[in-house]
Amino acid sequence: MNDRREDSLTMHGRTLRKKSYRIIPLVLSLLLVMSTPISASASTRAVPNENADRWGTGASCPTYPHISGSYETIDRLESVAENEKEFVMKVQAGGHTLELFLTFPDTGGFRLNTNSKGYFEPAGNGKIVYQKSADGKVTMKAEDGTTVIFEQKDSGFRLSVCNGEGKRLFGITPGQIGFSFENGKVIKVRLELPLAEQESIYGSGERFNDYDQVGKRLLMWNVDVGYNRPYSSLADSEMWRGYKNIPILHSNRGYTLFFNSYYSGSTDIGWTDSNKYTMEFQGPDFDFYVWTGTPKENLADYAGLTGTTLVLPKWAFSYIPGQHSSVWNSYGGSMLGTILKMQQGFKELGTPNIAAAYCEGADITDAKIYNALKKTGTRLLTWNPPDHNVNTMKGFLPGVDTLDLPITKSMTNPVSDVGCFVDFTDPLAKTMITNRVGNYARVGWAGGLLDFGELIPLRALFRGNGTTGEEMHNMFPYWVGKVYHEVMDETTVDGGVTFSRAGCAGAQSYTAFFTGDQYTGTYGMSRQLIAGLSGSASGLTMWGADLGGLDGTPSDEMYARSMEFSAFQPIMRAHGTSSRFPWDYGTVGKKTYQKYYWLRENLVDKIYSSNISSSKTGLPLTVALNMEYPNVQEYDGLYTTYIFCDDFLVTPVIEEQSYLYDVTFPTGSWYGLENGEKVEGGETKKVEAPVDFIPVYIKAGAAIPVKIGESLKLADSMQDVDTTEALIVTIPDEERESQFWKDEDTCVTYTSTRVDDSTFAINAGEGNDAIAVILKGSASYGVTVDGTKLERLYSQPISKGQAGYYCRDNGQTIINIGNNDWKQIEISLGEFKLENLMKDATVNNEKLQTTIDGDYETIYAISTKESEQDLIYELKKATAVETIKVKWTSVYAEKYKVSISSDGNNWKEVLNEEEGYGGIKVIDAEAENVKYIKIHDVERKTGIIPVLYEVEAYGAADEEHVSGNLVQQLENFLWDVLHGDLEKSYVIIIFSIAVLTIAVSAIVIVVLRKKKQNKMHATKEE
C-alpha cells in the first residue's frame, strides 16, 4: 500500500481541482450521460427531467431537474383534532385527502407537516394548551411564546402566527399551500407566504448575489456556480446559484422559516410577485419549522434541530497557506521543491512554524513530504475527491467483491455504477477512507478540501440508506463530512479539519467550509464577504475564503486587503491558481502578512473559544449587523460591516486605492483595536484605513483573552520568545459578562462593571491565566489589583519586567500585573492633554497646507518637480516632539527621509525609509527643542505620484499631562506621601492645595450666602 499513488476521477485529473480547467466536470458529465437511462412507468413516481434546465445553469454538473405538473391548493377542511401534542387538520386538495400536523417542538417555534416529513426530527414535542374564544378561534401557545391561532372560515381555515409579545407576523390560508399529484401520490409541494413592504429576507445558504434576497429567485440545488470569472462576465448575471443551498429564511418581520427538505427546489422572493414569496420542492415532503424570537435565538433553535457546529482543533485557527496544484508542482520545480521553497520563505519572514499547509495535488503516500513538513511542525492538508475508480477502491478494500464496493449505483440497474461516486452512507465507505488516510494521519496528514460535492446525479442509488440522487444530491455534503470527521477523530494525532465547498443543513456538525471559487480583486472579495455572512446566517459557522481569490493574480494592494480580511474570518486560509505566498506581493504583501499573521496568533485562543461557544449555542462567529441588531431597519441588507467573535466590529476594505473607509457603528461605545480611537455609535463614520490597516473596533465592556510576546504588544513577533496570557479590555457602558472557553469543559468568566463615571472594574473567575491587561480607548490615572495600587511606569513594560501600568497617549494603557492570581482590577480613567503640534504650523509650500488642515479628505500630490524639493513644516514654537506621523494614501513613496531641526539649518535624520508601502508611518522622534520638520529625498516610482493626506506631530505625554477626577488626584497624592515619593508629588501637592483652597472658599461663600438669605427671609416674615 505504501507505494500506491492515488487516482481520482482520472489519473491526470487529480492535479486539476478547479473548474477554471473544466477537465474533471467534463469527464464526469460524460460518465453521467453514459449511465443507464431512467425508464419511468405509470406505476412509479414522477421522475425529474435532467435535460429540462429551465434555470439555464450552464454549470458543469447535473442540471436542475424539472418535474412537470400543476399544483392543487387545499380546497376544503374536513375536520380538526385537538390532541395532547399535535393539532391535526384533515384537508382535501384536488380530490386527495391529506393530514396537516401542527406541533410545538422542544427546539422552539412550531412545525407544520404532512405524513411525509423531512430528515430532521426534534427530540420531542411540547404539550399543547388550547384556549377557545367565543367566536370559535383556537389559540395554541408554545413555551417560547410562539402562538398559532386557528380559525375556521366556512370550508377553509386561517392560521395566524404571533410571537411571544403577541405581534402577528403572518397568516396561512388554504390557498398558500399547494401539492402536485401523480397516481395519487405527492410529487411536488409549495408554500406561499406574504411579503410585506420593506421586508428583508436573508439566509438561504451561502449566497453571492447579495445579502438581502428580496426581489430575487434562488435555486435550491447545489451546483458548481462558476463565479470564478472576471467581474465583466458576471455583470449581467442573475447569480442565483449556490454551492450550499439551505432553505432557511430570516425575515426582518421577526421570524425564521426552515423548510425541512433536501429535494431540489427553488424560492421566489418577490421576483415574480412583489407581494409574496414562494418555496417549491420537487419531492413528497411538506414539512417546515417557524421560530419567532430574535434572529440569533431562531438560529440557535435551528442548530438545536439540525446540529451545532463542530469544534476544530486549535491549530486550525492559525494561518494556513495553500494554492492550486499547478503552482505546487511548478513553483519550486516539484511538489517537494515548492514545499522546501515555502519553508525557506516563511523562515525569512520570521514565521517558520506554519501550523498546516494545503498542498493540493500532494501524494499522501510520499514520506519525503512528511519528513520535510515535520521539520517545521507543519501538518499536511490535501485535496479529497468525492469519487474513486473501482481499482483504487478495491485497493483500499481488499477482499471486498466489486459489486459490494461502496460506489453509487443506478436506481434502475443495481449493478451499474454511476460516476464512481463513493456511497458515504455505506459503512464500508468509512473503512475505505480509514484505509486510505489512516496510516498517514498518524504521521502528519490532517484533512484538507472536500471538493465537488455538487455532482451527484439524480439516477444515483445510495444503498447505505436507500436514498436516490433526488434527495442525496443536496444532502451529499452531510455524509461526506460525517465520514471524514469520524475517520479523523479516530486516526489523527491532534485532530483534523476538512473544508467543504458544497454544503447543506446539518453538514455544519462535521465539516468546515470554504466560500467556493471567486475571482481576484474587489468584486470577488465582496462576494466572499456576502457568502460568509449569508452562510453564517444559515448555520454554516466555520468558514474561510480563498485568500486573494481563486482565479487570477491580485494586485499587491488587494492581496494585502485580502490578508487583513482573512485574519478576521473563522478560518484564515490561502488558495489560488497563482502563487499566494506573501513574498510575491512586494513589500506591502510581506509587511501586511507579518502583521496579520502575528495578530491572528494573538487572537487564536479567542477564536477557538468562540468556536466552542458556537458548538454549545449554535450561534455563528461572524454575524451581520441586522442579526445582531434586528430592530435597526438601516442594517437590513447591509453586509459591509459585521460582528466577529462577539466583540469585534469588522469592516473589510473592498475598494482599491482607499485610505478612508465608511464604517457603520451600532449604538454604544466602540474602541479601535489598533489605535484605541473611541467612537460613539449610532452612525456611519469615515475612518482611516491605510493599506495595512483594516478598520476593527472592539465593543464596550469586552474582556478578550490573547496570547502575546514579551513586548506586551499586539501583532509583535512571538517567534522564539516566551509568550504571555493577557486580556484586551474596553470601558463598559454597562455591566457585561464575557466567557472564555479554554477547552470544551473549562470556562473562565470575566465581568466588567462601572464603579463611577471615571472608574471601572474587571472581575476574573476561576481559571484566569492573564498576567497582563491591555486597555483600549483611554489613558489611566491609576490601577489597583485586589486593593493594591500599581505604580505608573514611564517606559514600555515587558512581561517579565516590573509590575505597573504604562500609557503614552489616550488610546491605550498597558498593565503588567506579574501574576494570574488576581480577582479584581480597578482602573481609573485619565486623559492626556495632547495636541497635534502641526495644527498651527506654517509650510514652505502653500499646497502643503492640505496636509496639516485636519481634513483627511484633502490631499497633497508630490509632482515630479516637487519631489525634488523639501517639504518643510515650521512649528509655532520650539518644543519637544515625541512622535511624527506621516500619512500616505494608497499611492505612496517607497523611499523618503524625515528630519528635524531647532533652527532650520542643522538637521537630524529620524527616518530613512527604504521600503515604504504607504499607510501611516509612526516615527519615534523623542527629541527636545524641535522647531522644524522636513520630509525630503522623496523617490517616485515611474508613473506614480506619491500622495500625502496628513502629517502630524505630538509632544511627550509626561506625568503632568495626565489628569483624572479630584478624588483620583487626592488618592494618588496620599499614596505618594505614604510611600515617601514626595519628589514626584510636588506638582500634585501644589495643585491639590490650590484645589482645596478653592473648594473651601466656595463652601464658605455658599454658607454665608445661605445665612444671609435666611436672615432676610426672617426679617420679611416679621
Model-derived features: where do they sit?
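Trp- and acidic/polar-enriched beta-sheet ligand-binding modules for extracellular glycan
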Residues: K865-Q869, S890-A957
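Extended extracellular/luminal ectodomain segments enriched in beta-structured repeat modules
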Residues: G767-A770, S867-E868, K876-T883, V930
